[in-house]
Design a protein with these regions (language model features):
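Short terminal or interdomain "cap/linker" segment that borders an active site or interface and mediates
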Residues: 142-167, 172-175, 181-184, 191-218
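Activation/maturation switch segments at domain boundaries
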Residues: 1-29, 190, 194-202, 206-218
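Short coil/loop linkers at secondary-structure junctions
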Residues: 35-39, 86-87, 170, 190
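Amphipathic interaction/junction segments at domain boundaries or subunit interfaces
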Residues: 79-173
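Short secondary-structure junctions
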Residues: 133-137, 187-194
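N-terminal, charged low-complexity regulatory/assembly segments
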Residues: 2-80
């Protein structure tokens, strides 16, 4: 079975939100079941309730999948909080969301970058594809720079954060941000010829999330 579950190394990656969300949520609940198996059924039931109550937030097809994914975190958070307390619950949710597909995401990204004639252009293409097909209208993007050497895209509105805030759990937004480390860590500037920088995020208190790809100086 391929470790590249998202198909990143194929060279013509297009997000499949239905597949990708299913993979993430299967890994999320399976991980939680290891230590909190007695609560998983209740988490899933609460997840369905939250989806029904938040359908009005769906603005397009990507938002439908992003809503489902984000509300899984809220459901788990609500069920774990009474027994674990806030810091431990946030950490448990983070680990369950970030780690199950972490290595597969890193390895898939690394394989794509290593195989690409131009790793910078390859990852910029993935970013642009995800902006359109995986994020959609629930996010607002600004692109102050997009040329042969730099692709700087700033997220000015984050659907994940909006959903979490609407459901009383904005403190979970950094969990969503943390998943990106899985692909960010695959970038090796000396090896791939470019660097990536994200100095802050909306979830960490920033006004926006800067995703900045920059080629190395010659």
């Amino acid at each position: 079975m391929s470790t590249d579950q998202f198909g990143l190394s194929d060279g013509d990656y297009v997000p499949d939100p239905d597949r990708d969300t299913a993979l993430l949520l299967d890994g999320f609940y399976d991980h939680l079941a290891r230590e909190h198996g007695d609560l998983v059924a209740a988490m899933r039931a609460r997840h369905e309730e939250l989806e029904a109550a938040n359908r009005h937030l769906i603005v397009d097809e990507p938002a439908r999948h992003n809503l489902r994914m984000t509300l899984a975190l809220v459901a788990a958070y609500e069920l774990l909080l009474p027994g674990l307390g806030r810091p431990a619950t946030i950490e448990a949710v983070r680990v369950a969301f970030v780690e199950p597909l972490g290595e597969a995401t890193r390895q898939g990204t690394l394989a794509m970058l290593d195989a690409a004639p131009d790793p910078f252009l390859a990852l910029v293409a993935v970013s642009k594809s995800r902006e359109e097909h995986a994020f959609g209208k629930g996010f607002v993007f600004e692109r102050p720079v997009d040329d042969e050497r730099r692709y700087h895209v700033d997220v000015r509105r984050c659907f994940y954060h909006d959903v979490l805030a609407a459901n009383g759990a904005p403190e979970l937004t950094p969990v969503m941000c943390a998943f990106d480390a899985n692909w960010i860590e695959a970038i090796e500037p000396d090896r791939h010829g470019f660097a990536f920088e994200r100095r802050t995020t909306i979830g960490l208190g920033g006004s926006h999330c800067p995703f900045h790809f920059t080629r190395n100086q010659d």
